[in-house]
Amino acid sequence: MKQTKTLKVRVKDKHAAQLNRMARSVNFVWNYLNELSARAIRERGLFLSTYDMHPYTKGAGKDLGLHSQTLQEIAREYATRRKQFKKTRLAWRKSGGVRRSLGWIPVNTGAAKWKNGQVFHNGCYFKVWDSYGLSQYKFRSGSFSEDARGRWYFNVVVEVDIQPNQAQGEVGIDLGLTDTA
C-alpha cells in the first residue's frame, strides 16, 4: 500500500545567495499576478483563473531565472489562496525590509530530480543534508522554503510503501470486578 509523505531536508548554506535571487523573482511574479488579477476584477469584473494567468507570464522564466513550471505553480498557488480567503487582492510579497516575506520557491512535479547525490532544479545542483535517502524516492511536487534564520529547506512530496499493521498482539481489559468480589 502506498502513502504520500512530505520530506523536509536542509539545503547547504552555500546555495543561499542563489535561492534568495530566485525567491526575489518569485515575489516579483506573485506581485505581478496580484496586480493583474486586481485590475481584471476592477475593469472587467472577472476573476482570473490559473489558466487565464499563464499567457501573461509565458516566457518570463528565462529573464527571471525561474523554471517555467515554477511560474505555473505560482499562478496556481495565487489563485488557490485568493479563492480560499475570498479576496480580490492578496498581500504583497516583500523581498526586503524588516517585514519581508520568507523565501519560497514552488517546484512542480518533474521539475526537480535527484542527480549525482544532489537535488537538480532549473539547471542547478543543490547539495542537501540527505537524512532520508532521497535517491530511493520519485519526487512529486515540492518547494524550497526559508526559515526566519535564513536557512533553506527542500520540501518534497514522495510516495512511500507502508506495511499494514497485522495487530496480532493481545489486549487486556480491566473490568474492575476485583473490588466487588
Where are these regions (language model features)?
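Nucleic-acid substrate recognition interfaces
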Residues: M1-A181
